């Protein structure tokens, strides 16, 4: 009887283990239902200015038909989101942003001359479905302390 119970327990344990190993949605490439983008930001390399330029890598899934990006001061973005809402702001980025011509699995961009705190929003579109991703970049702001002509003596 004890052998029978042990074998039955082993069969139940094996069955429970096998049935618990189901594939979760979104883990297999090509099964996504909505467009998606992941934004990676890097320090810009020469000849760009690493203090005020940012390099971005955009990773798109296979459902993306078109993509747009908009870089603006973080305070301006916050005020627009407060008045328009998230969906309205995504529409704003699509209509006023820059269209990314080549939507490959990975696309690289370099944004230049960014002084202060910026929010970079990327919106991806598939039909009437939209998804956005945001990254922030803070570029150095320079302020003149003294104006005038400087003379240096060489000895």
What do the PLM-derived regions correspond to, one by one?
Residues 1-9:
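Bacterial N-terminal signal peptides that target proteins for export
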Residues 2, 15-46, 140-153:
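Bacterial Sec-dependent N-terminal signal peptides
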Residues 45-57, 103-107:
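Ser/Thr- and Asn-enriched, surface-exposed coil loops between beta-strands
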Residues 54, 58-89:
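Solvent-exposed loop/turn segments flanking beta-strands in beta-repeat/beta-sandwich domains
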Residues 91-101:
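Extended, solvent-exposed segments with strong compositional bias
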Residues 100-103, 108-117:
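Surface-exposed, short loops/turns at beta-strand junctions within beta-sandwich domains
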Residues 112-131:
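Beta-strand-rich modules
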Residues 131-139:
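Edge beta-strands of extracellular beta-sandwich domains
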């Amino acid at each position: 009887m004890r052998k029978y119970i042990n074998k039955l327990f082993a069969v139940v344990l094996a069955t429970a283990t096998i049935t618990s190993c189901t594939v979760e949605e979104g883990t297999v490439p090509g099964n996504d239902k909505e467009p998606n983008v992941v934004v990676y930001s890097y320090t810009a390399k020469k000849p760009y200015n690493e203090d005020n330029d940012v390099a971005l890598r955009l990773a798109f899934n296979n459902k993306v038909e078109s993509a747009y990006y908009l870089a603006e001061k973080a305070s301006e973005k916050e005020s627009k989101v407060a008045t328009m809402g998230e969906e309205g702001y995504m529409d704003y980025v699509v209509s006023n942003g820059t269209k990314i011509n080549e939507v490959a699995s990975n696309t690289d961009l370099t944004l230049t001359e960014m002084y202060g705190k910026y929010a970079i929003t990327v919106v991806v579109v598939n039909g009437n479905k939209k998804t956005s991703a945001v990254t922030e970049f803070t570029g150095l702001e320079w302020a003149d302390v003294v104006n005038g002509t400087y003379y240096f003596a060489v000895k």
